[in-house]
Curated annotation (Swiss-Prot):
Lineage of the species this protein comes from: Eukaryota, Metazoa, Chordata, Craniata, Vertebrata
Species annotation: Vipera ammodytes ammodytes (Western sand viper)
Cell location: Secreted
GO CC, one annotated term: extracellular region
Glycoprotein in keyword set: yes
Protein name as catalogued: Snaclec factor X-activator 1 light chain 2
GO MF term list: metal ion binding; toxin activity
Length: 11
C-alpha cells in the first residue's frame, strides 16, 4: 500500500 502524496512531506 502506498500513502498519498499529501500524507507525506512534500518537496
Amino acid at each position: 500500500l502506498f500513502d498519498p502524496p499529501d500524507s507525506x512531506p512534500x518537496y
